[in-house]
Amino acid sequence: DIDTLLLDKTGTITIGNRKATHFHTAPGIDLHAFVENCLLSSLSDETPEGKSIVELGRESGIRMRSLNTTGARMIKFTAETKCSGVDLPDGTQIRKGAFDAIRKIVETAGNKFPEEVEKVIAAISSNGGTPLVVCVNRKVTGVIELQDIIKPGIQERFERLRKMGVKTVMVTGDNPLTAKYIAEKAGVDDFIAEAKPEDKMEYIKKEQQSGKLVAMMG
């Protein structure tokens, strides 16, 4: 019988369809201009997240016709850079991505990462959301909040496994605050945050060394 079950968060514990729910601006940044920049960087983004950013922007009253992407160069998301965006013909560079990735871009350029924005990021994360940080010309302009939905009935399933003596472990690329919130909501016993494939292997090895039989799902 298995002792430990590792589960991928996305699609197994959550529905896996993260949606943009809020635009949060950095101090002194105009909301309308911020939303336009978010949309410009998402227009050719085919991911569910990208499409939901465009959708939320439309609902915020942004006229799509006023967005000009002629001659723009789209920057695709990669696992290495952890961000995506657009380079506009006038030299404007817009990037959106993970907190650590954008912080690196901003601080490498000698700019400060606003404390107020860090607070917003912490609040989104501890509420189970995913913060996508946006910067324009290497200066932070705000955060897009994404939310994922935990599958109904998942807590009961984990409760049953617990009674059978199975330890459940959620594996996610989310930051530790978001991971902790979702792990608690879903009712798993443990979690691996900001997980890379080698972290998963490391955890499995550790469990096996203590004589546990480990299975993986998702």
Per-region residue spans from a language model:
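Cytosolic catalytic headpiece
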Residues: 1-13, 18-218
